[in-house]
């Protein structure tokens, strides 16, 4: 099996701010479709799940050069402002599940 050059699979954890859980779930629904509409993410299936503490974990794949282009894309920057109001991005290692050999999360339906 060979990796596809230039594409990057990422796992990111979003810890909702108090009272912002619903906003974060809505952002999770919008996130990758918006990135795809801007040609920044691939069609690789998205996985979204939730940790016991309410943190949302998302797995998606950036298109080649997508990460760099996202940082200057006004549509993405506006979305990231909404994320900043709704959550904090935290290291995966901060989730209690991450200390288990088989980290288990509750799947989210997007």
Locate the predicted segments by residue.
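An amphipathic, aromatic/His-enriched active-site/gating alpha helix that lines ligand/cofactor pockets
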Residues: 33-46, 61-97
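A short beta-turn/loop motif at secondary-structure boundaries
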Residues: 47-53
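Active-site-flanking beta-strand signature of metal-NTP-handling nucleotidyl enzymes
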Residues: 7-15, 57-59
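Basic/polar N-terminal segments that are highly enriched at the extreme N-terminus
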Residues: 1-3, 110
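Short, surface-exposed ligand-recognition loops at beta-strand->loop->(often short) alpha-helix junctions
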Residues: 15-27
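Short, low-order "capping/linker" segments at domain edges
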Residues: 98-110
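A structure-centric feature marking long, well-folded core domains of fungal metabolic enzymes
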Residues: 3, 10, 22, 33, ...
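Short amphipathic alpha-helical/adjacent loop interface patches that line ligand
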Residues: 28, 32
């Amino acid at each position: 099996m060979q990796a596809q050059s230039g594409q990057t699979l990422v796992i990111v954890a979003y810890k909702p701010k108090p009272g912002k859980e619903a906003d974060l779930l809505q952002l999770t629904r919008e996130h990758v479709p918006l990135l795809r509409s801007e040609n920044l993410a691939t069609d690789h299936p998205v996985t979204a799940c939730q940790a016991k503490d309410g943190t949302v974990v998302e797995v998606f794949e950036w298109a080649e050069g997508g990460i760099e282009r996202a940082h200057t894309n006004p549509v993405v920057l506006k979305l990231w402002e909404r994320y900043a109001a709704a959550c904090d991005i935290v290291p995966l290692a901060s989730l209690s599940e991450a200390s288990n050999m088989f980290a288990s999360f509750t799947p989210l339906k997007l």
